[in-house]
Amino acid sequence: MADAAIHGHEHHKPGFFTRWFMSTNHKDIGILYLFVGGFVGLISVLFTVYMRLELMEPGVQYMCQEGARFIASADACTPNGHLWNVMITYHGVLMMFFVVIPALFGGFGNYFMPLQIGAPDMAFPRMNNLSFWLYVAGTSLGVASMLAPGGGGDLGTGAGVGWVLYPPLTTTAEGGYAMDLAIFAVHLSGASSILGAINMITTFLNMRTPGMTLHKVPLFGWSIFVTAWMILLALPVLAGAITMLLTDRNFGTTFFSPSGGGDPILYQHILWFF
């Protein structure tokens, strides 16, 4: 024992990859949500700026079949309606499913709720990591959808169907696989949100510090708790709707087609319930 070495037990700082790609820490994951959400938000804002640039003057100056322009030109411009529809679609889909919900719920909720209720971390830290990377995978599919062949033929790529994804436009008019990728992107974002909601609810109910009754929880914690329940109950309904869109497109079902006994208005009921 005279030769025994004393080993230090001080904290070892993780490397960059370990911390930011494999983290289960609620603060790190909250920061990652905000970072990715901010990046996607920048893309979405650029879309709406481009649309407003086009609307600024009468006629069509920028969205041309000859090629998208960013500076007004005297050259001939044949209007490209498909590009306009793509801008509207992805601005809405990205903002709703990949910016607002992930940043405000996933980002701020992850970072602040455990701090406010005195919890050391989220109830399921490893599931928290899974939730984040499902969100990143969904974001990647959304970006891939913008670059995939759409229903505009030679007019360009992407699904120009509007952010609400109404049939029959989504089931019959958009022949390219950009629409399918967009549906899968929303699926993955929804799965991420459902896992996150389960995590938030469990953390709120089971991990409050001793003495913190429900009446003593800050209102921000309550807002995350209530939002988590709404996500948990409503998102599976939307998942069912877009799954029916997917099968109508690819497997010959007629959930939304009157020709096969389907109801074209059913999707709208389901979407606006969500």
Model regions: which residues?
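Membrane-embedded and interfacial regions of multi-pass energy-transducing membrane proteins
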Residues: 2-274
